Regions:
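Structural alpha/beta surface segment adjacent to cysteine/selenocysteine redox centers
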Residues: 2-82
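C-terminal cap of thioredoxin/glutaredoxin-like
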Residues: 83-163
């Protein structure tokens, strides 16, 4: 996703291409936690925060890979605590605090059971309706395209008229 960010925005700025980010927690609780944190601030921050997650994905994955048991234990806590505890233990509150989402704001967002359930239900409903099996998944004019890298997507956009 990071390799195509700037070129994609150039197509969008030309008025020929539109881009809509839809977040799906296809990989389970960690995706749900990160998705909720990217949506914790103002709407205009969602894409920049998502870009930061993708750009730092290896760093984000290190604590959970090093301590899967702690993450799994956090997921056994009551719903209003589990994502807060996981984010504290894995350093995700610090990650987002460095990008404008205060720790208090992050804790509040991650304790919002209704919002988390809505996100999980959204993922379940649309993942099956649109056959979303991984990320990224791209759709062009209502049809899923067989591309998950910028190198594969750009020629498809160009064949559809993007310049």
């Amino acid at each position: 996703s990071m390799e195509g960010g700037e070129p994609l925005l150039e197509y969008v700025d030309s008025g020929v291409v539109s881009f809509e980010l839809r977040q799906f927690a296809v990989h389970g609780p960690l995706d749900l936690l990160l998705q909720r944190m990217t949506q914790c601030g103002p709407v205009e921050a969602v894409i920049p925060l998502s870009d930061q997650v993708w750009a730092n994905y290896e760093t984000i994955m290190q604590p959970i890979q090093a301590n899967q048991a702690a993450f799994e234990a956090a997921m056994q806590r009551p719903m209003e605590e589990r994502f807060v505890v996981a984010a504290e233990q894995m350093g995700y509150l610090d990650f987002f605090a460095a990008r404008g989402i205060s720790e208090d704001q992050g804790r509040q967002c991650l304790a919002d059971v209704g919002a988390l359930e809505d996100m999980a239900n959204y993922t379940q409903r649309y993942s099956s309706e649109f056959d979303i099996t991984g990320t990224p998944t791209f759709e062009l004019n209502g049809n899923k395209v067989d591309a998950n890298t910028w190198g594969a997507l750009e020629p498809i956009l160009q064949r559809a008229g993007a310049r």
